[in-house]
């Protein structure tokens, strides 16, 4: 029940986007020496960030990338592109700098954190943060993938990270 209260408290603190800051961000972009829309999705992200922070000029000095790893029980139905062993292998590879994401993180000086939220196979890799909700979800074709309590706990864990 504590997780449920934490989630409800966090939801109650979410405020509407600052549309004034978003308009100001769009105006600023229109004044920059570049073709309109030439930065693509980055322009949309900067407008949304202005709406969230209430400021047109934002900096993100250092980032941390979280990779939350878990297995899905519906793999039993043969609908997955890869076996569950790939979840574990990729999780370990991420901690060793052997994936595209980990190489990019290293290049830009960002921290990459791998979190076990439900890896099914056993492993020994101290670099993986254990926040497991169980050994993967259940097969949602046959039963609910997880309980409400598990889902809420997962969301609250993500918020804490």
Pin down the residues of each PLM region:
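N-terminal loops that bind phosphate or other acidic moieties
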Residues: 1-161
